[in-house]
């Protein structure tokens, strides 16, 4: 069964590269191979209710983008990635809880596993009576673990700045 997922926006950003946190030492490496490459970020409404829905949505979105010749979406080359935002609520009538974001998930299988992992993590925190802290997370597929890469206190911490060198796309 198809489910309609509404989009909030689509915008072009410039890839800034990535940080690689080495586990065997205290070093963080910077990979600038994709730095400066344009990327299309598509932001959807918070209407996806499960990890399997997220996987289905992304599979469809990738197929659509490829069929329209917008991008190759080669996941092995980092050309199609997902940032998953997760927030829980007790029932449909309540507003969404505090959001966490898992960055740069690079396969549909990992999207499903990472989201399920974070849902379980948040459930455990809430069942203890503690509060979810807004943060950015990284998923490690080999160990099926998540770690916090930075805390975010408010919307300003996301640091969105328009780039004067990029013209608006209408």
Language-model segment annotations:
Residues 1-170:
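Basic, nucleic-acid-interacting segments
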